[in-house]
A protein has these predicted regions:
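Short beta-strand micro-motifs within the conserved protein kinase catalytic domain, predominantly
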Residues: 72-91
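Conserved activation segment of eukaryotic-like protein kinases, specifically the C-terminal portion
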Residues: 197-214
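Activation segment signature within eukaryotic-like protein kinase domains
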Residues: 142-143
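Conserved short submotifs of the Hanks-type protein kinase catalytic core
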Residues: 88-104, 108, 112
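Protein kinase catalytic-loop region centered on the HRD/HxD motif
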Residues: 148-158
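Protein kinase glycine-rich loop
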Residues: 13-19, 24
Length: 341
């Protein structure tokens, strides 16, 4: 119990997920003055209790942004509990977040539409069918939602640094949400204490979607364009149906650092030009704003074609031409808001 909020979870239940930081279980949160009403939540038990992992968990829990395309975080809970074997009181740490009923974008792309508990996600099936018949609109629908979420995250001062299909959820409620803020960081802290958390790791994010500055360990140059690069690779995969670079991690890293994304594989000229701008090696030549990238995608969706940009990745405002359309800490506040929904 913390800040008049009571929570519980069942360790015998099927975990919602598991990673290097901990195990996520389905849970419930109650008001202490009304235990008959509760909201379903996901509770991450932090099993890696190294100090840097605890600090990352606290940072992740603090990213409490209310947006339909972002996972809602409710707070961080430190608690003293008896060890199951020695019965000695030891600290345990939890991150409380929104419980999503859905499947990852990665699963959907592989033709998996059921959750671990056997629940069928109809929206994921619809998107998959759309991808089989209309790759352009499939790409636009998914990327529009993702770009809106990332744009909000950026406006709040954070970069995600791990954008890939496994960290995007498609829900029963027909929402597409970005999840997992484990390596998300405030841009303002790049040269501060948070940089040490970054330096303690090896490679941030998935190699398949990693920008050159991520792979080079160039922490001081991690910024909003780092996410833009990953979004470009993701857009490529959605349209083409495959990643631009394949092979072992070493060869993929070399390709991201010095190779060219084969954008010619994208048959739609508008989508192709957006991807080309997003994945440029030089950061100042990429889109400098996800909002502008979204504007370009919206224009393409509306039957307009984006022309070559100004070389700074700032979009093509004024250059659109018509074409034929082709087909916790802060736990109480977070939970209180959730109860009001």
């Amino acid at each position: 119990m913390q800040n008049q909020i009571y929570y519980d979870y069942d360790t015998d239940s099927i975990p919602l997920g598991q990673g290097g930081m901990g195990i996520v279980y389905p849970g419930r949160c109650f008001r202490t003055d009304n235990e008959t009403e509760y909201i379903p939540v996901a509770i991450k038990l932090v099993t890696n209790t190294a100090q840097d992992m605890i600090e990352r968990a606290m940072r992740e829990a603090s990213i409490q942004i209310d947006h339909p395309n972002l996972l809602r975080m409710y707070g961080f809970i430190p608690n003293m509990e008896p060890d199951p074997f020695t019965h000695e009181m030891k600290p345990r740490y939890y991150v409380v977040m929104e419980n999503l009923d859905g499947v990852s974008l990665e699963s959907m792309l592989e033709g998996v539409f059921c959750t671990k508990t056997g629940s069928d996600i109809g929206y994921a099936r619809e998107l998959y069918d759309m991808g089989c018949n209309d790759r352009r609109n499939f790409t636009v629908e998914i990327m529009s939602a993702i770009l809106k979420g990332v744009a909000c995250l950026h406006r709040s001062g954070y970069i995600h640094r791990d954008l890939d299909p496994s960290n995007i959820m498609i829900t029963r409620d027909r929402e597409i949400k970005i999840i997992d803020y484990g390596v998300c960081k405030p841009v303002a802290s790049i040269n501060g204490a948070d940089a040490k958390l970054t330096m303690s790791g090896s490679i941030i994010g998935k190699v398949d979607y990693a920008a050159p500055e991520l792979l080079a360990g160039d922490v001081q140059h991690h910024n909003f364009t780092t996410d833009v690069y990953a979004l470009g690779i993701l857009m490529y995969r959605l349209f083409v149906g495959a990643l631009p670079f394949e092979g072992d991690n070493s060869s993929i890293m070399k390709a991201h650092l010095s190779g060219e994304v084969p954008a010619g594989n994208i048959s739609d000229p508008g989508i192709r030009r957006i991807v080309e701008k997003a994945v440029r090696k030089q950061q100042d030549e990429r889109y400098q704003s996800v909002d502008v990238m979204l504007e370009d995608l919206s224009a393409v969706s509306g039957g307009l074609a984006v022309q070559d940009s100004d070389g700074k990745g700032n979009g093509a405002h004024g250059t659109w031409v018509p074409v034929l359309a082709a087909t916790v800490t802060g736990l109480a506040a977070g939970i209180a808001t959730a109860f009001m929904i």
